[in-house]
């Protein structure tokens, strides 16, 4: 009995040590995930197991072999210290997540604090179990294509909708395995409990169906959502897409380049709107060329997997193809809002990949990118309902909720005021304000976008001032020359709004920028005068 307790205690100690400091090369990296994951997410359970082992040994009788009992006690103490540290780190994730959202460079989000936010639901933490929301309905195995794996499930509460927001979740599994019933459960349960409709598709897998089959199916599933989700209470205009690992890669690529003809599936025409409001990427593979500047020794293994099983083409000679399927290379100004969640101890996807993606996104896109970097956290941490999973789920729900609130077409009650604006528009040039048409001489044709009063809801002056500071910093990071503007209503029916004049910005980019800041419309100033354009389509109002 003593030797059994010794062996199990040694394994628990090794597992916890691997969770705290995993190997990152070769076989050590491969073993670090299955060995270290258990301790990282089940630290409380490991403490209970160790206590039971010591109790059993005490009941059975302490070993008579000299020094063996002392070794067992020393190992038990080590297991206790390691797992208490891991448990503290897991609960600390709540603070890490909150600070990540509140400290975002622009459009910061506040997470509400509560007793549950600090401690979690104790029985969920103990059991690592996320139950279905009460009354949840699951419509299983609905066909979205012809292949046997083109099946999806729809989760909803009976009273969801009409017009409920939708989350499309793509499972992971290295593009070669996985199932819609296996992953993302704690997050999806929380979304459904808050009135969302969740859609979980299967998709074709390599090596039987190599790239672009997985991506074609992901796009086909999104097209099904756009066409059919209204019959399940969802709003096709308020869709976010999420996924973990390979699913995070597919979700990111759907959000950034879902309309690319290279993977547009049969039967999905140009008339289908394939845009999404946000992407929630959990430990996603956001770089597909294996660049070791980001992968820190793991890139060779990625490229080997892609060459042999997924893409089934050598990287050499097909570099453009590999770059085209890399989300990091597809970031445009009109990219949707992103949440990037990544653990620093992930031995399958290095955390530097997420850092590089976020840096490039913030220098390229108008929408916000929220980056949650979790210390001492492995791949696939969100399989169980741990305190860490609870914290990141709250972040995902907050980001998704903000994204689906983004302004759409101009509401009818505002259209009349936009068509005949009584606004005096001024632009700041060389320290003085000049009229909108006078500024044409210096700037040429330009657009004016404001961050004030998002969704045309009057906002406190201090909040508008903060958003202007954030927008100025964001535009500077994008390398855009922005001049301050002021639009005032002589009748006094609407408060004055400040914003930025941008010369050389296309109408499409102006619309994307306006949407990213929650605006229904923007000004366009040309030699023909000042007009107001709809941010949803860029059409003149």
Residue ranges of predicted features:
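N-terminal cap/lid segment of alpha/beta-hydrolase-fold proteins
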Residues: 35-55, 64, 110-162
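Short beta-strand element of the alpha/beta-hydrolase
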Residues: 163-174
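Catalytic nucleophile-loop/oxyanion-hole region of alpha/beta-hydrolase
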Residues: 179-190, 199-238, 383-392
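Primarily recognizes the serine-hydrolase "nucleophile elbow" in alpha/beta-hydrolase
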Residues: 220-294
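Mobile cap/lid helix-loop segments that gate and shape the active-site cleft of serine hydrolases
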Residues: 290-330
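Short beta-strand/loop motif that positions the catalytic acidic residue
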Residues: 334, 340-342, 346
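Conserved alpha/beta-hydrolase "acid-adjacent" motif
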Residues: 347-356
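Catalytic active-site module of serine/aspartate enzymes centered on a nucleophile-bearing elbow/loop
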Residues: 387-407
């Amino acid at each position: 009995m003593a030797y059994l307790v010794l062996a199990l205690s040694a394994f628990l100690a090794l597992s916890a040590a691997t969770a705290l400091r995993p190997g990152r090369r070769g076989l050590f990296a491969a073993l670090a995930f299955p060995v270290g994951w258990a301790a990282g997410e089940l630290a409380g359970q490991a403490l209970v197991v160790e206590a039971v082992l010591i109790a059993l040994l005490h009941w059975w009788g302490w070993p008579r072999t000299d020094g063996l009992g002392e070794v067992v006690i020393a190992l038990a103490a080590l297991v206790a210290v390691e797992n208490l540290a891991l448990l503290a780190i897991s609960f600390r994730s709540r603070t890490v997540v909150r600070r990540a959202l509140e400290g975002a460079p622009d459009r910061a989000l506040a997470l509400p604090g509560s007793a549950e936010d600090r401690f979690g639901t104790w029985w969920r933490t103990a059991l690592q179990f996320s139950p279905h929301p009460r009354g949840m309905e699951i419509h299983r195995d609905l066909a979205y294509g012809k292949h046997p794996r083109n099946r999806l499930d729809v989760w909803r509460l009976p009273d969801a909708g009409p017009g409920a927001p939708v989350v499309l979740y793509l499972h992971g599994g290295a593009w070669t395995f996985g199932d819609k019933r296996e992953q993302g459960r704690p997050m999806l349960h929380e979304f459904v409990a808050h009135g969302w409709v969740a859609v979980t598709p299967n998709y074709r897998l390599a090596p039987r169906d190599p790239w672009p089959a997985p991506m074609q199916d992901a796009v086909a599933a999104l097209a099904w959502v756009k066409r059919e989700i209204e019959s399940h209470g969802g709003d096709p205009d308020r869709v976010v897409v999420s996924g973990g690992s390979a699913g995070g890669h597919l979700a990111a690529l759907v959000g950034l380049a879902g309309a690319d003809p290279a993977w547009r599936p049969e039967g999905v025409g140009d008339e289908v709107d394939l845009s999404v409001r946000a992407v929630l990427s959990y430990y996603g593979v956001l770089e597909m060329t294996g660049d070791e500047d980001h992968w820190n020794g793991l890139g060779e293994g990625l490229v080997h997997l892609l060459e042999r099983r997924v893409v089934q083409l050598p990287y050499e000679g097909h570099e453009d193809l590999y770059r085209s399927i890399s989300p990091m290379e597809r970031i445009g100004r009109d990219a949707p809002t992103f949440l990037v969640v990544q653990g620093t101890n992930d031995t399958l996807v290095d955390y530097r990949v997420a850092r590089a993606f976020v840096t490039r996104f913030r220098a390229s896109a108008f929408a916000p990118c929220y980056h949650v970097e979790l210390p001492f956290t492995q791949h696939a941490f969100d399989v169980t309902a741990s305190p860490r999973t609870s914290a990141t789920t709250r972040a995902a729900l907050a980001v998704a909720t903000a994204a689906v609130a983004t302004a759409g077409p101009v509401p009818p009650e505002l259209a009349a005021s936009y068509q005949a604006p009584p606004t005096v528009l001024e632009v700041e040039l060389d320290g003085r304000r000049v009229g909108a048409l006078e500024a044409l001489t210096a700037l040429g044709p330009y657009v004016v976008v404001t961050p004030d009063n998002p969704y045309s809801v009057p906002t406190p002056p201090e909040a508008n001032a903060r958003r202007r500071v954030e927008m100025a910093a964001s535009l500077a990071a994008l390398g855009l020359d922005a001049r301050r503007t002021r639009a005032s209503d002589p009748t006094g029916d609407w408060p004055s709004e400040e914003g930025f004049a941008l010369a050389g910005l296309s109408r499409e980019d102006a619309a994307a920028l306006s949407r990213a800041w929650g605006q229904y419309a923007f000004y366009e100033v040309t030699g023909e005068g000042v007009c107001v354009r709809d941010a949803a389509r860029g059409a003149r109002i």
